[in-house]
């Protein structure tokens, strides 16, 4: 399970990057009217998203056996989810970086910036979809479930909502944006709660209703039950912190801590995901052998 750390780092960082862009950066940069504080906060969120995705892309090369052969990966767009994933990853990275450059050089949501933001949002959404499609394999039934795309989406949504709420709560986005912190805190609470409920009930191999019943060539999933308990504890702690902010507590420190706990829980969950029985993703089977 631990040998899959490059895939764990890639998926968590990439999904968080898309979520931070869609939920934290996009609303601030696309907002009408000149607001230097909101623009600055939006650029910070966008830079964090681009940096996380660039790091995720670099980490993905650690996973492959022959990185130089990765140039072949775009040759199978019609049949391979991996090819589509890489295409949309590169498109999202380029479009998000171009949008950031446009927002920095030309303040205000002009036509060019709006178009770049919309295109980057579409590419990011398709990137997440392609990432989930890689695991839709009949030979890996524990991964080929609705929880896989849902958990990927919840990682993106939770990270993005928590980042957006924190930027507003700490005043980085300006007083006008700070006044709209509440909906993002509520969205954070719902996202973390949904992740916790899914992990407890339907996470393959560990959820209450999806525990393995057939023998496997790999060690039983119960050997990693401690990590699942840690994951649930991290999500419960994050949920408690966000709940405290909803109840009126000051959010700057609590939301930052909740974001860290949520990312840690997502990382633990991804290690459990890759520890399930089944073939490795096609990235290490078809293109780089």
Regions found by a protein language model. Name each.
Residues 1-52, 275-279, 287:
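N-terminal signal-anchor module of multipass membrane proteins
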Residues 5, 11-15, 32-37, 78-80, ...:
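Long, contiguous internal "core" modules enriched in hydrophobic/ aromatic residues
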Residues 20-27, 39-95:
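Membrane helical hairpin/interfacial module
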Residues 66-77, 202-221, 276-289:
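Cytosolic, membrane-interface loops and tails of multi-pass inner-membrane proteins
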């Amino acid at each position: 399970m631990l040998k899959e750390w490059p895939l764990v780092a890639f998926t968590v960082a990439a999904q968080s990057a898309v979520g931070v862009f869609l939920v934290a950066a996009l609303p601030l940069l696309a907002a009408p009217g000149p607001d230097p504080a909101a623009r600055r906060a939006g650029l910070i969120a966008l830079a964090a998203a681009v940096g996380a995705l660039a790091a995720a892309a670099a980490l993905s090369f650690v996973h492959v056996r022959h990185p130089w052969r990765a140039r072949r990966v775009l040759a199978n767009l019609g049949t391979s989810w991996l090819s589509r994933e890489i295409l949309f990853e590169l498109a999202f990275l380029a479009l998000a970086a171009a949008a950031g450059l446009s927002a920095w050089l030309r303040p205000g949501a002009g036509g060019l910036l709006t178009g770049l933001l919309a295109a980057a949002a579409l590419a990011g959404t398709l990137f997440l979809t392609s990432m989930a499609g890689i695991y839709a394999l009949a030979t890996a039934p524990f991964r080929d479930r609705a929880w896989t795309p849902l958990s990927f989406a919840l990682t993106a949504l939770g990270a993005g909502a928590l980042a957006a709420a924190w930027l507003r709560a700490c005043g980085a986005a300006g007083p006008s944006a700070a006044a709209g912190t509440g909906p993002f805190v509520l969205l954070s609470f719902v996202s973390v709660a949904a992740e916790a409920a899914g992990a407890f009930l339907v996470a393959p191999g560990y959820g209450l209703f999806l525990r393995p019943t057939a023998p496997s060539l790999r060690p039983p999933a119960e050997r990693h039950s401690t990590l699942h308990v840690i994951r649930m504890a991290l999500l419960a702690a994050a949920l408690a912190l966000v709940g405290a902010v909803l109840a009126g507590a000051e959010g700057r420190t609590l939301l930052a801590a909740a974001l860290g706990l949520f990312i840690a829980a997502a990382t633990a969950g991804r290690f459990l995901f890759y520890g399930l029985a089944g073939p490795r993703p096609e990235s290490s089977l078809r293109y780089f052998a």
